[in-house]
């Protein structure tokens, strides 16, 4: 058999499918990141080695701002190409909805690099609006105000408009329009108004219900007519500048996007014909990310189109309807936050330890005095073959069930239970091997593979760093970042360090779309084994929660040019004191309480003065240390 090659690892983890040109494996067998054309490739193992020397420990979120820049350029170039092809006469405005990732460094990078592309920002709440207004965006860039609004929200937006910012208040509910009219009249400011329209068309994938007739936001046709009548009565007709729709995030099928565009553009036609001058059509988000690399619409973690196809369909739909109806071509706004940010962040976690299922080794024997159930199961394992694998598996399941019942009744000793466990899992392994050789294995036998992966315990919290994996079964590309020139010899699920059985990942990207175990290597003594979780730049940081009080991880910004990489910034993860403060514990008071307890224990002679001093030192240092496990 030939030696394992890096090309084999690349295929095994489907890196070309999901990695685009950003992620690949180098000749050392290490994962590398190439943020842009002309940039040097960054060896992730070398990055981790350097961070380790700086005492920056995993879990670590690596951010590559140059990838953000590249995504902005890519989307903008796609629109430029489509405009030329379809003779589009309007402008395209890329607007970043900061809810996707509100981290200041991310927003500022998008605004800074996006200034030459007139990148705008979208706020969906009052706190987000405060952040957006204080961000130094280009004066020509748009600020789109979505979400529910109160009087303070509207007043803030209108006064920002008066001071020169291009702010558009998008009406989500009919009563917001009345409130906008009241506040604008009081402030004597003519508002820039948009209306979100509830389309019948819906998206596809996990967020399909975000669009369609039952969607949370938007005005239906009847409400839209009421809104238009209200604008006319209050002499605000000229204020309506934008119509907006959104049919859901991560749309998997391009056909759904086309249907929505066709429906939305008819609203533009109807409003134009009755005298409203609409300058902007905001087509919302939905541009997908190919998390599993299959370029398929059959699952929820991919999509069957490219950015260019998405843009072409958007531009051509708008141009076609305007030409047919002899109408001016409005500007297009896109809010593709997931596509902008997903690729720029990589989570690196290290494996702490492993456990595997017990097996019966070949040098073990069954004796005359062993329990009859153990003898029977041993004979099944000893003689199992493809001709009777179904029957053998059913018999093994029955014997195991009988043994567990007898043990619960006190009729089976611990030694026999252990024998049954080892033999059962040995049978399961053999059944799985025989099943893999079948051309059309039955579903029952295919499920055996899901029972067998080892457990790799990793230093992270699924709920903090990958909440979508837990909440909605989102798949992310996951793989070791080194030893990729070696053939993996283990299949594992990943377990986090929370005290929660849901804190695990048991579904992984593969060339076929999904696998119930991750191919990994055996651990080597004294050598860290790092696993990378890719495409985590959208939503994960901001949705993460503090289950078991595990806080934000360390974050590292890496700048790249043609000559190499630089660790531009290290942002320390949250300390124990930080997370305790969130739940109303005062670190200073905690220390005082512990000091009093230790002093009292020393007075009573329970501990020595040296033991008390050591305990207090450990307590204080731990209080201001990382919430995750730290190893020398």
Predicted regions and their residues:
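Active-site-proximal beta-alpha core segment in soluble small-molecule metabolic enzymes
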Residues: 87-282, 287-293, 299, 304-309, ...
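Flexible, glycine/charged-enriched surface loops at secondary-structure junctions
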Residues: 58, 62, 84-89, 274-278, ...
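Low-complexity, highly charged intrinsically disordered N-terminal segments
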Residues: 25-102
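Conserved, well-structured core domains of diverse proteins
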Residues: 1-57, 559, 566, 576-580
């Amino acid at each position: 058999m030939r030696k394992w090659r890096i090309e084999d690892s690349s295929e095994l983890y489907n890196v070309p499918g999901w990695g685009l040109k950003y992620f690949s494996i180098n000749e050392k067998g290490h994962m590398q990141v190439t943020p842009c054309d002309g940039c040097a490739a960054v060896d992730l193992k070398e990055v981790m080695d350097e961070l380790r020397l700086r005492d920056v420990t995993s879990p670590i979120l690596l951010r590559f701002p140059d990838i953000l820049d590249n995504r902005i350029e890519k989307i903008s170039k796609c629109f430029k190409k489509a405009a030329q092809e379809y003779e589009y006469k309007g402008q395209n405005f890329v607007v970043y909805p900061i809810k996707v990732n509100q981290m200041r460094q991310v927003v500022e990078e998008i605004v800074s690099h996006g200034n030459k592309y007139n990148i705008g920002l979208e706020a969906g709440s009052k706190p987000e609006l405060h952040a957006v207004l204080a961000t130094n965006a280009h004066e020509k860039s748009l600020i789109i105000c979505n979400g529910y609004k109160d009087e303070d929200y509207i007043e803030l937006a209108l006064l920002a408009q008066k001071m020169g910012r291009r702010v558009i208040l998008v009406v989500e509910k009919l009563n917001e329009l009345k409130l906008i009219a009241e506040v604008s009249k009081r402030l004597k400011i003519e508002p820039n108004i948009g209306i979100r329209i509830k389309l019948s068309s819906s998206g596809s994938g996990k967020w399909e219900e975000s669009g369609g007739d039952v969607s949370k936001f938007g005005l239906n046709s009847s409400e839209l007519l009421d809104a238009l009548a209200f604008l006319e009565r209050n002499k605000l007709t000229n204020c309506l500048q934008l119509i907006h729709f959104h049919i859901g995030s991560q749309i998997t099928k391009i056909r759904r996007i086309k249907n929505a565009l066709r429906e939305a553009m008819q609203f533009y036609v109807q409003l134009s014909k009755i005298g409203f001058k609409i300058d902007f059509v905001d087509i919302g988000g939905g541009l997908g990310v190919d998390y599993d690399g299959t370029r398929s619409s059959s699952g929820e973690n991919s999509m069957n189109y490219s950015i260019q196809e998405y843009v072409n369909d958007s531009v051509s739909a708008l141009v076609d309807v305007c030409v047919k109806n002899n109408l001016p071509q409005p500007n297009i706004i896109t809010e593709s936050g997931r596509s902008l940010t997903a690729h720029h962040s990589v989570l690196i976690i290290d494996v702490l330890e492993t456990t595997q299922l017990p097996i019966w080794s070949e040098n073990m024997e069954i004796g005359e005095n062993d329990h009859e159930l153990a003898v029977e199961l041993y004979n099944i394992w000893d003689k199992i073959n493809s001709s009777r694998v179904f029957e053998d598996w059913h018999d093994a399941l029955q014997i195991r069930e009988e043994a567990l019942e007898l043990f619960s009744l006190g009729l089976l000793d611990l030694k026999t239970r252990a024998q049954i466990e080892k033999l059962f899992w040995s049978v399961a392994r053999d059944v799985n091997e025989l099943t893999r050789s079948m051309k059309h294995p039955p579903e029952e036998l295919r499920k055996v593979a899901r029972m067998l992966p080892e457990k790799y315990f990793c230093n992270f919290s699924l709920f903090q760093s990958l909440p979508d994996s837990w909440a909605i079964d989102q798949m992310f590309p996951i793989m070791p970042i080194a030893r990729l020139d070696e053939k993996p010899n283990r299949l594992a699920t990943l377990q986090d360090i929370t005290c929660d059985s849901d804190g695990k990942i048991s579904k992984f990207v593969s060339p076929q779309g999904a696998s119930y175990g991750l191919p990994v290597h055996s651990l080597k003594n004294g050598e860290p084994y790092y696993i990378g979780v890719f495409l985590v730049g959208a939503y994960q940081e901001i949705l993460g929660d503090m289950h078991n009080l595990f806080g934000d991880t360390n974050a590292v910004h890496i700048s790249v040019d043609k000559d190499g990489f630089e660790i531009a910034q290290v942002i320390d993860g949250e300390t124990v004191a930080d997370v305790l403060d969130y739940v109303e514990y005062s670190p200073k008071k905690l220390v005082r309480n512990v000091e009093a307890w230790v002093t009292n224990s020393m007075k009573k002679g329970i501990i020595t003065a040296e033991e008390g001093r050591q305990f207090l030192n450990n307590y204080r240092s731990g209080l201001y240390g990382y919430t995750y496990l730290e190893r020398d």
